[in-house]
């Protein structure tokens, strides 16, 4: 009997519109070599029978910046949420609020750093229970808005020093299921902001696009808050120091 192990499932979305990107549009490299994951409806890419250990999946698509994600293959199936960011040839240039963020450390460019940017989405999503304890893998949530929250999707629980990044894998009624247990406790009414992962280039710069003027939280790899930015219409240029 032939057994196939699903090593990783990657869901790919357009980071500007939130729409699904079908796998047939993507060019994929795994650990530097071209690969062809199995594309499934709904923007899913399926990687099977990978050697145990760390891997890097790179994704390219016309109109978008190159994106990559690192994960470790093992006995369990890894669930990955990837957003492709608009590039120079992206079609909706006039509708964008642009951010160019320069990141420095010790006066030098902070190259190759992973940062999360989180901003309010079309739907307001908040914790709806008195307290969500650290170690809990589910949350009672309150959603308000015309559009359904992105599920599965990555979010920042905006909670000051207790802020953290989570992956919301399912939402049934008011109950949200998390990919991993909470690292920190959170109280009622803490907001869940849609979050996207970015990588600084060799000059310590990243570029992002948003649908409207907004407040953006800049976070480190684990969701620790580094800066808050207010974006206005048109081009926005900011510098932060780690």
Per-region residue spans from a language model:
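Autoprocessing Asn-cyclization modules and mimics
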Residues: 118-185
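Short, acidic Ser/Thr/Gly-rich low-complexity loop/linker segments typical of extracellular
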Residues: 19-22, 29-49, 124-126, 130, ...
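Exposed aromatic-hydrophobic patches
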Residues: 44-49, 142-143, 179, 203-210, ...
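Extracellular beta-sheet/turn segments enriched in Thr/Pro/Gly and aliphatic residues
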Residues: 1-2, 72-95, 230-242
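Short coil/turn motif common to extracellular beta-sandwich-like domains
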Residues: 2-8, 94-98, 136-138
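Short, ordered, surface-exposed loop/turn motifs in non-cytosolic proteins
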Residues: 16-32, 98, 105-122, 212-213
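Short edge beta-strand/loop segments characteristic of extracellular beta-sandwich folds
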Residues: 9-13, 98-104, 142-144
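A short, solvent-exposed loop/turn motif at the edges and junctions
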Residues: 44, 48-73, 215-236
């Amino acid at each position: 009997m032939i057994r196939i192990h699903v090593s990783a499932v990657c869901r790919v979305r357009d980071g500007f519109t939130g729409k699904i990107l079908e796998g047939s549009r993507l060019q994929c490299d795994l650990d530097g070599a071209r690969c062809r994951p199995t594309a499934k409806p709904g923007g899913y890419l399926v990687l099977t029978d990978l050697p145990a250990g760390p891997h890097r999946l790179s994704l390219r698509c016309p109109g978008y910046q190159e994106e990559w994600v690192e994960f470790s293959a093992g006995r369990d199936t890894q669930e990955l949420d990837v957003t492709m960011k608009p590039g120079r040839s992206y079609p909706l240039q006039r509708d964008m609020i642009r951010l160019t963020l320069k990141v420095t450390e010790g006066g030098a460019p902070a190259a190759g750093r992973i940062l999360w940017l989180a901003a309010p989405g079309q739907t307001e999503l908040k914790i709806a229970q008195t307290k969500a304890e650290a170690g809990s893998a589910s949350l009672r949530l309150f959603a308000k808005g015309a559009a359904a929250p992105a599920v599965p999707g990555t979010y920042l629980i905006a909670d000051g020093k207790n802020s953290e990044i989570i992956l919301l894998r399912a939402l049934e009624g008011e109950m949200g299921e998390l990919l991993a247990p909470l690292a920190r406790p959170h109280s009622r009414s803490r907001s869940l902001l849609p979050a996207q992962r970015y990588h600084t280039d060799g000059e310590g710069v990243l570029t992002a696009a948003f649908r409207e003027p907004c407040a953006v939280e800049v976070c480190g790899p684990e969701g620790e808050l580094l800066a808050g930015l207010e974006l206005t219409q048109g081009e926005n240029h900011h510098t932060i120091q780690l």
